[in-house]
Curated annotation (Swiss-Prot):
Membrane topology: Lipid-anchor; GPI-anchor
Phosphoprotein is among the record's keywords: no
Signal sequence segment: 1-26
Residues with a covalently attached lipid (GPI-anchor amidated serine): 637
Subcellular localization(s) per the UniProt record: Cell membrane
One of the Pfam families matching this protein, by short name: COB_C
Gene from which the chain derives: COBL7
Protein name in UniProt: COBRA-like protein 7
Family classification: Belongs to the COBRA family.
UniProt keyword list: Cell membrane, Glycoprotein, GPI-anchor, Lipoprotein, Membrane, Signal
């Protein structure tokens, strides 16, 4: 009985000890298994599109050149869609800064259509390929493989030796409808930016139609799949000119097949080289063992397509395609709407794994050019809503293409590119002509082979020298410089080397108006059919009245109605090539020529200074190509009468020189 009171406290103490043990253990486990969460990454904090550029590796490559050492670089561009909607046709601009030459790029193409390797020292835009769209996390339940694009780059840069990192100056999302701040650097090798939707951009059409809207451009190309089978499809290619001064002569269209496709047949156009050897020696012949490859038109990875002559328009094999077969001529709509587009069809065979009716992929890296025409840069094909065509059966219905892509091309001026036409100025108050600039259309880069100066300014000319080829002008030019008491450089200035030149002559200036004379010279070997020229007048265009030998009118460009468009009248639309003189052994060759006087009124342009500059164009175009202009204007001298008398005294000397020539 005495032990009972001692037993109860001991039992109570033991119970408390047992209860306290698991409590202590539980608290300890909680502290060790639940560490504080790590901070979210920069991409997780972006509620838009996250773009990053990561330099991964660099190394020195030959040759050894301390002043201009090349290095290999490897980097990765990541585009991650953290927005609410799908990102259509993603494009990323990278502002390279170290004279980079891009050698390879995975999962992307260059949006300007350039083929690798290519210099990207001024920056370039990458476009997604073969997958150009990025789904959102909402659409994919967070599947990063559908939300993200990863582009691995390999190239060469100059001057940045490891361990230094050749990061670009900036990266940004170039897709329409997005706003990006300046990219920030993280660490030593990462440049990143978070782009958000532009609240002022209307993207309802994209959301409603699931296709990007068609865009405007100087020239658009539609790639429409009009028939599709498991192994091949029929594509219709339509080129349309939308620039009032744009034009193509003898167009040549090229592109890159990216998935081993080849062209079996064509209508409305033809490859510049017909060759199936690449298929016979490649995987195409192994897969299509029963196909007669002697009938294949082109197996080139980058074929060049040319237009057919008009004689093939009604040919059942090669023609019978609307708007085909015009020798590659595409005119502005203002000249002839029926000649402002060109169309052809081609049957394209596919290769595994694309052997099903819905596996359709357009070619990439489109490029188009012509002779004596503007230069175009074309973007990547963009998937748009299927095109509709009039039913060929004549029924009042439209047929829809299986799939459609649009390529937009715009006129550009390549760096260091030379014009292909030039302008000279003259006026009634000065008997000298301000000629085209020295080397206006380029000169040989081989200084040793030149017997002339590419830097000396061109010498003033007498009026009659305009009709004489440059190589026959020397005596006239030197004699004129002597009479005008002007120095003659040694060596003499080089010629302009232009196939086409245009003389703008200010003919009269009176109280109520003024006149000018335009003369177009063709010094080349090719006739120009349906030629046109255009002059931009900053202040005088509203006063234009008429051209007496040309069909001319004022047109608006970029919202300004200051350009006068001129073309040959019916029957006079040929600018013939240079031809032999009456006596080829004695007389110089004669250029093709078209000329007209233009009249202007001052009623709508009061206060203009015609001789001081308003009577001369600020820009001149021939067949869409912008021409080189002189840097000086004819001078109006108080000694004008004295100049006339000197000119009259010089006439016998000049006549003697012409007879000797």
């Amino acid at each position: 009985m005495d032990s009972a009171p001692n037993f109860i406290p001991r039992l109570l103490l033991l119970s408390l000890l047992i209860v306290s043990i698991p409590l202590t253990s539980s608290q300890s486990d909680a502290n060790t298994t639940n560490p504080s969460p790590s901070p979210p990454s920069d991409s997780d904090l972006c509620n838009g599109v996250f773009v990053s550029y990561t330099h991964t590796k660099g190394s020195k490559i030959p040759p050894n050149d301390t002043a201009n050492q090349p290095y290999r670089f490897e980097s990765v561009i990541t585009v991650l869609n953290h927005g609410r909607d799908e990102l259509k046709s993603w494009r990323v601009f990278v502002k390279f800064a170290h004279r980079e030459i891009l050698v390879s790029a995975s999962n992307a193409v260059l949006s300007d259509g350039s083929s690798l390797p290519v210099s990207v020292e001024n920056g370039t835009v990458f476009a997604g390929y073969p997958s150009s769209d990025l789904k959102s996390a909402i659409q994919t339940a967070g599947d990063v493989t559908q939300m993200q694009a990863r582009v691995e780059l390999v190239g060469t840069q100059f001057g940045v030796a490891p361990p230094n990192v050749p990061l670009p100056k900036n990266i940004t999302l170039a897709t329409d409808g997005w706003k990006c701040p300046k990219a920030t650097q993280k660490g030593t090798n990462v440049l990143q930016v978070c782009c958000i939707p532009d609240p002022d951009y209307d993207n309802r059409e994209i959301i409603d139609n699931e296709f990007l809207p068609r865009k405007d451009g100087d020239l658009t190309i539609m790639y429409d799949v009009v028939r599709s089978y498991s192994s091949n499809y029929m594509a219709q290619v339509t080129m349309e000119n939308h620039n009032p001064l744009g034009r193509l002569d003898n167009w040549k269209l090229s592109f890159d097949w990216m998935r081993d496709e080849f062209i079996y047949t064509m209508k409305g156009a033809y490859p510049s080289i017909v060759d199936s050897s690449d298929c016979v020696d490649g995987p195409q012949a192994k897969h299509y063992q029963d196909l007669d490859f002697s009938n294949v038109l082109s197996c080139a990875r980058r074929p060049t397509v040319i237009d057919l002559p008009p004689t093939k328009y009604n040919d059942s094999t090669f023609g019978l395609i609307p708007f085909c077969c015009r020798n590659g001529t595409i005119l502005p709509r203002s000249m002839d709407p029926s000649k402002s587009s060109s169309v052809f069809q081609m049957q394209v065979y596919k290769m595994p794994p694309d052997l099903n009716i819905s596996a359709l992929s357009p070619p990439q890296n489109w490029r188009i050019n012509g002779t004596l025409n503007p230069d175009y840069k074309c973007g990547p094909p963009v998937r748009v809503s299927p095109s509709q065509f009039v039913d060929p059966s004549g029924l009042p219905s439209n047929r829809t293409a299986f799939a459609s892509w649009q390529v937009v091309c715009n006129i550009t001026q390549p760096k260091d590119a030379s014009p292909r036409c030039c302008v000279s100025f003259s006026a009634y108050f000065n008997d000298s002509i301000v000629p085209c600039k020295t080397c206006a259309c380029g000169c040989s880069s081989n200084k040793a082979a030149r017997a002339c100066s590419a830097t000396a300014p061109s010498l003033l000319l007498p009026q009659q020298a305009l009709l004489v080829p440059f190589e026959n002008r020397t005596e006239l030019t030197v004699a004129w410089a002597y009479l005008k008491q002007r120095p003659v450089p040694n060596p003499m200035p080089c010629g302009d080397n232009c196939g086409v030149s245009i003389n703008w002559h200010l003919a009269t200036d009176y109280r109520g108006g003024w006149t000018a004379r335009v003369t177009v010279f063709n010094w080349g070997e090719t006739d120009f059919v349906d030629w046109f020229t255009a002059v931009q007048m900053k202040n005088a265009a509203p006063g234009f009245e008429k051209a007496y030998s040309f069909n001319a009118s004022t047109i608006g460009i970029n919202g300004k109605n200051n350009t006068i468009f001129m073309e040959g009248l019916p029957g006079l639309n040929y600018l013939v090539a240079e031809r032999d003189g009456e006596n080829p052994l004695k007389n110089p060759r004669i250029p093709g020529k078209q000329q007209s006087v233009m009249s202007f009124t001052k009623k709508l342009t009061p206060g203009i200074n015609v001789p001081g500059g308003d009577g001369f164009p600020s820009k001149v175009f021939f067949n869409g190509e912008e021409c080189s202009l002189p840097t000086i204007l004819p001078m109006r001298s108080s000694q004008h009468r004295k100049h006339i008398s000197v000119f009259l005294l010089a006439l016998p000397v000049l006549a003697l020189l012409i007879l000797r020539a």
